[in-house]
C-alpha cells in the first residue's frame, strides 16, 4: 500500500517527517504510535486501517525504542516496528 501522506497529515505528519521515510519504505505501513502495552504498540496512520480494520494496528516493539507520538515504519512480514523515524 503506497504512503498516504494526506491521511498522515491529519495526525501531524510534516514535510520533515515525509523526507525521513526512505524510498524503499514507501510501500510499507507508516504510522504514529498511539498506545504502548508491554512490548506492543498500537499504530494509527497510512495503511493501518487496511490492516487493522478500525484505523489501527497492533504490532510488536521488539528491538525498537518507541514512545507514544513517535512515527514508525512497520515490517509487514512479522508485524513489528521496523524503524522509528527521528524525533
Regions from the language model: what does each represent?
Residues 1-87:
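N-terminal accessory targeting/assembly segments
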